[in-house]
UniProtKB/Swiss-Prot annotation:
Its EC number is 2.1.1.228. One of its GO terms (molecular function) is tRNA (guanine(37)-N1)-methyltransferase activity. Keywords: Cytoplasm, Methyltransferase, S-adenosyl-L-methionine, Transferase, tRNA processing. It is found in: Cytoplasm. It comes from Flavobacterium johnsoniae (strain ATCC 17061 / DSM 2064 / JCM 8514 / BCRC 14874 / CCUG 350202 / NBRC 14942 / NCIMB 11054 / UW101) (Cytophaga johnsonae). S-adenosyl-L-methionine binds at G112, I132, G133, D134, Y135, V136, L137. The keyword Metal-binding does not apply. It catalyses: guanosine(37) in tRNA + S-adenosyl-L-methionine = N(1)-methylguanosine(37) in tRNA + S-adenosyl-L-homocysteine + H(+). One of its GO terms (biological process) is tRNA N1-guanine methylation. This is tRNA (guanine-N(1)-)-methyltransferase.
Length: 226
């Protein structure tokens, strides 16, 4: 997978890709991540990427020209499965969406900033708008990181134990149930006996039941889709 991230703050994005799972994926050659500074595509001497709103109003708007030039340049080099705009009014990211998108070869993620982007960008360039929740951030960069992490960890070969991703919360519209590690008895707080029984079928049944109960208590809405 190749991820091209368009941003005005590339320095905000670099370090998360230099650690943990995302770094491992890049080192293995399973993922390429490229950052594109919008200021490199401006045509004005000030390297500004924003301007005042037509009709007045609070907040600056990201201009269409540098975004157009950047996206057009990238599209001239390869085809993209999706051109994504991180937006609070986009479709809320979920595991089903991540599963599908993790199979893409090339995506562009545009990070909004200021008040947002010129509507013509959304009308003519963007193929999908994604939100990470019902709240507003200072820019789309953190959302782009969340999306990237959600996709990258699902790519075959990234996780040392690929079955780990298959048992994550939301994979079957269920939350993960309780998990434990050693010691089996700590201050009298004991791990459920079934988990130390060595009986694979009973352990699997316990985990399924525990996941269902946990979901019923925390996110009953998910069971409507289960």
């Amino acid at each position: 997978m190749r991820i091209d991230i368009i941003t005005v703050l590339p320095e905000l994005l670099r370090s998360p890709f230099e650690a943990s799972i995302m770094k491992r994926a890049i080192d293995k050659g399973l993922v390429e991540v490229h950052f594109h500074n919008l200021r490199d595509y401006t045509t004005n001497k000030q390297k500004s990427v924003d301007d005042y709103q037509f009709g007045g109003g609070a907040g600056m708007v990201m201009m269409i020209q540098p975004i157009d030039d950047c996206i057009t340049h990238l599209k001239s080099e390869r085809e993209y499965d999706e051109i994504i705009y991180m937006s609070p009014d986009g479709e809320t990211l979920n595991q089903k969406m991540a599963n599908k998108m993790s199979m893409y070869e090339n995506i562009i993620i545009l990070c909004g900033h200021y008040k947002g982007v010129d509507q013509r960008v959304r009308d003519h360039f963007i193929t999908k708008e994604i939100s990470i929740g019902d709240y507003v951030l200072s820019g789309g960069e953190l959302g782009a990181l969340v999306l990237s992490d959600a996709l990258i960890r699902l790519i075959p070969g990234v996780l040392s134990d690929e079955t780990s991703a298959l048992t994550d919360s939301f994979q079957d519209n269920l939350l993960s149930g309780p998990i434990y590690t050693r010691p089996a008895d700590y201050k009298g707080w004991k791990v459920p006996e079934v988990l130390t029984s060595g009986h694979a079928a009973k352990i699997e049944k316990w985990r399924e039941d525990a996941a269902y109960e946990h979901t019923k208590n925390r996110r009953p809405d998910l069971l409507e889709e289960h």
